[in-house]
Amino acid sequence: MGRQFICSIYLPYTINFHLDELEGNHESHPAITHQEKVTQTHRDSVKIDDILTRLSISKSESGQATPVLTPQLEGMNDYFSLGPSKRTGGSMTPGLGAMSPIPGSGRSSPLYTQPRSRATSPSRVRQADRFAAPGIGAGALPIRRKRRDSLAKSVALFESARWSVERGVVGNSGLFHAVDAAVRDHGLQNPLWVGLLGMPTESLSEKTKNAISGALLVKHQSLVVYTSDSNFEGHYNHYCRKILWPSLHYQHNEIFSFFHEESNWDDYVAVNRAFADALIKNYKTGDTIWVNDYHLLLVPNMVRERIPSAIIGLFIHVSFPSSEVFRCFARRKELLQGMLGSNLIGFQTEEYKRHFLQSCSRVLYAESTFDRILLDDRYIDVYAHPIGADPVLVDKWLENPETLEVKEVLEKRYANLNIFVGCDKMDPIRGIREKLLAFEQFLYDNPEYQKNTILIQTSTFTEEQKEYGVAISDIVTRINSAFGDFSLDHLPVTILSSDLSYPQYLALLSVADAFIVTSLREGMSLTCHEFILTQRQKKSPLIVSEFIGCASMFSNGAFIVNPWSTLELSLSMKKALTLSTNERNQRYSNCLDVVLTHSASNWVTGFETKLKKSWTSQQKRDFSRLPRFTLNFIGNRYDHAKKRLLILNFDGNAVTWEGRHEFVDFHYGYMVSILSKLIADDRNIVYIASCLEEDELESLFMHVPGVGLIAENGCYVLPHYAENVHQSWIRLYKKQQMDWREPLHDIIQYYSERTPGSSLIDHGFAMEFNYVKAENRENGLRSAGELASSINETQHGCRAVPLDGRVLCEPTTISKATAANYIMTHLIKNPEELDLILVAGNNRTDESVFAWANKSKVSSFTVSMGVGNTEAKAYTDGIPSFFNVLNSLCA
């Protein structure tokens, strides 16, 4: 059984160096960076340590590992911050840095002794090189010499130190938990993690790196990826955090884009290349590769270029914006092309999936369907499959002694109070400001709740969001000043500014009377799932922003609100506190069903199953793997068949709207003679399928009397003579199936007028936007992408197909397959006697009839005469080769 390579920017594990054991080294571990800064909010709110002291909540002394909280998809670690003063507190051993706690992770972060980053700011260096006058930078040589000396000392220091593997404190904890759950439930047999260590590694010697890699591979099934500190600084802290993250969440920052997007693109590519190289080196036939999230969007195509047959899946955990936002990325094409190296791409919601398909259509001009991107040589499946929490893990920790103890104390401390709870990192995207403003409005509008209702919000403050933290502080101060009673020690808003342990976090969720998540945009928010699992007894309601991925999942149970509407959110708070028992139970039951159904384990096994199914299906359509259509391939079964149906199409190579005479000059006589031989055999029923109109097609095949014809890609059928049906054209569509034509004509005309040199061509059954002769090719491509996206999003009954130099708009309810099915059910006498079907074609319009024949109960042969991804089960090298086989069959 093959291995499952699970790629995430960080491994679930990291390394702790025990430098305090070295002789002469008496330094203690460095202080935590984020604890140096204290904002005004701390003075207006009660710190978690103060609360725990006041409530006599003891911390667990057990040695049991505490899992990482799932609310935080990734840690915004600052261990690569440049200023030494920001890295350390007090004296430090040279070359050391502190692993910063995860801002907003919601748990205590163990402090590991690890190397300090050797990175210089890539963006600053490159911007200086870009705009500086000659000679600038010469004075840096002494600094570089000192840096080399310091690096040498650090390498020697860490090489002599003992180290241990520890559970990491940064990374996609939701993914980590999900994989652990799938392994526990036997849904995943042989996972192998691929990622970074979550710490700077330039100060480590090759010997140390190899030892660490070996230990993690053997004991922890983890493949370590190494990259330079500078590359990671540019990749993660600049390109990912300041370019991709904000824009993916509809917070595009033009200033950051100007300074970081192009300057840090090479770093993003370099880190992705390091992952791809590790995968390529270790991949074996039968293995699967599962790439996770926006940090590694280029990896799928990098691997595909080296291993064309690899099984590659990609899952995007964050939200995916509309095409209007995504096209703002300077490297939008490269990002999408990197993603399209996958066999399967997964998203949290149908909305994100639709946005991705639209982006591919508008940016890459790729043909797309509801759940698929069609490329020339293959296709990519796209689907929505939301991640979930692990009920088994949560239930286990709910029974933990510390959880029960904290819960008991909280219940006593806040008895007779209504408790709203929120858990978010301090980030404008999380909507803490909107939540506080709505709570303030709630207290103003409902005086009866002013003295008996509180909001407890956990939020870790970071230097990165200092200004936002000050704004939050102002609102908290205003609310507590207006509605607080300091004589009674009553504060309506409590900001817990330090991380909670996992038991404390679960205890807080379990005592909540309502849980409020008001993110302005978020991929999923697993805090909602965990809240539901903690409420089996109390059954408190959930208030969720409509802009979170889980909103659609909990639509039948939670209060779905617009966080921008202060009034709507305020009213939802009151409704949550005044629910009847029956409604409360029903809402909770609906939410619990969702959480249990969409569990973490089911998510992992579902993705793995879908990935393998997609790869298998795509392999069957791989043109290079198809058998050649020869006399030996079909001859025996053809000879023994008593009744045969042949549907042949030569449009793609032989007949086009502009090149029909080429077909006539080179193949016409040969084709007519072979078709005449086929029709002369009473066992054969022969149809020619084409995109041509009735008169053109009938004129072209006038020298083959009795042949059946399918015109305009299935809109009309002229029966084969042997069916004893009057040979007149039969229309296979109803007039209402063409209602899309009139409005579509105006849309295409609009794009044609704004694209000089382009034209609208009406083919009867279809319409075409042709920009082959457009004065500006780029303008034509842009118009084509917008047109295809607009039609596929808004028009019913038709779909736009981007082709080379044109966009073909065709009906969705009419095809060669519908015509073939009509022939089978209405025109062929005694269809049950049919024992062989042969379908051959050479362009994309034949794929539907290939699929139809493949699903038929009758023995079928489907043959592609073109090159590319196809539903056909065999191929030939063009029309002449196919004619030669037919000629041999007639002999």
From Swiss-Prot:
Coiled coil: none annotated. One of its GO terms (molecular function) is alpha,alpha-trehalose-phosphate synthase (UDP-forming) activity. Residues 106-124 have a biased composition (Polar residues). The modification Phosphothreonine is found at residue 88. GO terms for cellular component: alpha,alpha-trehalose-phosphate synthase complex (UDP-forming); cytosol. Transmembrane segments: none annotated. SUPFAM superfamilies: HAD-like, UDP-Glycosyltransferase/glycogen phosphorylase. GO terms for biological process: trehalose biosynthetic process. It catalyses: D-glucose 6-phosphate + UDP-alpha-D-glucose = alpha,alpha-trehalose 6-phosphate + UDP + H(+). Residues 88-126 are annotated as: Disordered. In the N-terminal section; belongs to the glycosyltransferase 20 family. This is Putative alpha,alpha-trehalose-phosphate synthase [UDP-forming] 100 kDa subunit.
